[in-house]
A protein has these predicted regions:
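Transmembrane beta-strand segments of Gram-negative outer membrane beta-barrel proteins
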Residues: 1, 20-22, 27, 60, ...
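Outer membrane beta-barrel transmembrane domains
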Residues: 68, 140-181, 189-191, 201-203, ...
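A generic beta-sheet turn/junction motif
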Residues: 20-24, 134-138, 169-173
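Outer-membrane pore/translocation modules
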Residues: 1, 8-10, 32-132, 181-214
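One face of beta-strands
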Residues: 16, 27-29, 40-42, 141, ...
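Outer-membrane beta-barrel initiation region
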Residues: 1-22
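Membrane-spanning beta-strand positions in outer-membrane beta-barrel proteins
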Residues: 26, 55-57, 104, 142, ...
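Transmembrane beta-strand segments of outer-membrane beta-barrel domains in Gram-negative
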Residues: 122-141, 152-156
Length: 214
């Protein structure tokens, strides 16, 4: 599933997420491939945490991105599939407020600009969301719940309202977790979106810290 939950590759995919940073600035690349080896998208986020103390939090970010899509072309009277590259530039703003130790409310806004002639020129993506940090199921198994979020999506002259929820099951001291995202349209006239989209993911997380010496 993509950053905007209404869209999906439609088949199994492999995702690589990395975060490299110091203090408030981080570089967060997100690389996606289909399991047949074809690239799906490369997103190169730069993020800055403006406010990190107190109840109110704020981060901003920007990225260049490359999306790949397969299109048929005619070569020497033969139809072949080729990979077309679409380039995008985007920026994000994400304020949130901590209601309690394990619960927060926030919103998220993303603006994207397509650079190709046949790509979506402008994208507006706005969400209102909440997060419950941990629900203890057993001694070392926890469920993280993102309560249903509402979001508005506008792609050029098409738009719609959607709802979305995320569940993540984790085990203490285990690098593997299982996550599922469910997305349902409320009212939409976006031709490329689907009425209902869901996925299930197996996640592997590693935490490696490096110290700069000298």
């Amino acid at each position: 599933m993509s950053l905007i939950p209404s869209f999906t590759l439609g088949k199994p995919a492999l995702l690589f997420e990395l975060s490299i940073g110091k203090n408030k600035l981080s570089f967060d690349p997100l690389i996606r491939f289909a399991l047949d080896g074809k690239p799906w998208s490369f997103v190169f986020w730069w993020r800055y945490k403006v406010l990190t103390e107190g109840k109110f939090r704020l981060h901003v970010g920007a990225h260049p991105a490359i999306n790949f899509r397969t299109i048929p072309v005619s070569i020497n009277n033969e139809t072949r599939d080729i990979q077309q590259v679409c380039r995008y530039l985007a920026t994000e703003v994400a304020p949130s407020i901590m209601i309690s130790k394990n619960f927060s409310l926030g919103m998220y806004y993303l603006y994207s600009r397509g650079l190709e002639e046949d790509a979506t020129k402008t994208t507006h993506f706005v969400t209102v969301n909440g997060s419950i940090s941990q629900i203890k199921i057993t001694k070392d198994v926890f469920l993280k719940v993102a309560p249903p979020q509402l979001f508005y999506l506008m792609l050029d002259n098409e738009d719609g309202f959607f709802s979305n929820a995320t569940l993540t099951l984790t085990k203490q001291n285990c690098p593997f977790s299982v996550s599922s995202v469910l997305n349902k349209s409320i009212t939409a006239n976006i031709s490329s979106s689907k009425s209902f989209v869901w996925n299930i993911s197996l996640l592997y997380s590693f935490n490696q810290k490096y110290l700069r010496r000298g």
